[in-house]
C-alpha cells in the first residue's frame, strides 16, 4: 500500500511552519498514543504513521529531500545498509553525483578533494525514549544503549583478511567515481566496483566481510532538561553512524515521548486536572487541597460553585524549557452526585429540595433559565 503524504498525515499544508507542524503532531500524538488506546490496533498504526511523518518534516534536511523528491527522497531502501555491499551513503550518495554535475554542486553533504573518493557524513541515528510527566517537569538523567561501530579486531579495520592487502580499485583507479556517457551527456557516477571507496579488497575479512567495522552497542548518558515537551529531540553530536571515506560521523537524536499521566493532562507548559467535589462544598464553599507536581496546594472554592467551573493556579504548571517561566495549573471541578444513600438521607434531601423550591427560582437560576427556554414546547 502506498504511503500517505506526510503533510496529509499531520493535517497541515506544505507551507506550514515548524511550530504548526509541531503543534499538529503533538495533538495527534496525544490522541493516538498507545497508553490512551491500549486495545486499539488502529490507533497504534496511526500513532506510528504520525510519528514517522513528524520525524521527516521536523528534520530540515529530510524535509527538503521529501519536498523535492517525495517518499523516494527519504526512503532508506534507495541505497544499501551498513552491512551490505552498496555502502551506507543513503539517498545523497545514490543521486549526489548526477545532480551535482548537472547543477554544479554536490548534493547530500559529500565532499571531494584532490580527485579522490568522495567523503560522506555518516547517517543520523534516532532513539525513542519514553519518560514520565514528573521526569519531564523536573529533568532526568538516563542511560541508553545505542548502536556503535568498532574497528574489526580480526583485520584491524582495513577490511582485508590478514595476510592479504587492500588494492586500488582497477575500475576507477582510486577516484571512487567513473564517468559515464549517455548520448550527448557525460556524467559522473559512483564506481560500481568499489562503491565509491576507491579501494578493492580481493580477499575480504571473513569476520566483518570487508567493511572494516563491527556493529556493537555502547552506553550513553542522556541529560533530559526540565520542561521538555512531547516530541522534542536531544542531539548527541558524533554518535550517529560512521562517515564514509573519511567523512565525519552523523549525530544521534533522542526523541522524547511522555507517558499519559493518571491525574494531569499537559498543554504546553500548563497542566489540567479534573477534580470531583461534594455537593455541600460546591454550595457552601470551602478550601480544597489539590495535588501538583511539586506537592500539594490549597485554594478557596466560593459558595454556589457550579459543576464545570475552572480555577487557575498561577505558577503551578511546568517550567518552560525555553522560557524558564512556569505555566499554570487549571483545576476543573465537577460536582459529584452522592450515591448509595440511606432512607434517612433521602428524606433529608427531599425536605431540602422542597425548602429550596418554596423560595421560588432564586436558588436555581440555571434551572429557571432552562425552563423559560423550553416552556413553549409544553404549552
Curated annotation (Swiss-Prot):
Residues 5-70 form the J domain. GO terms for cellular component: cytoplasm. Belongs to the DnaJ family. Binds 2 Zn(2+) ions per monomer. The keyword Nuclease does not apply. It comes from Cupriavidus pinatubonensis (strain JMP 134 / LMG 1197). A zinc finger (CR-type) spans 139-217. The lineage of its organism: Bacteria, Pseudomonadati, Pseudomonadota, Betaproteobacteria, Burkholderiales. Its main location: cytoplasm. This is Chaperone protein DnaJ. Pfam families: DnaJ, DnaJ_C, DnaJ_CXXCXGXG.
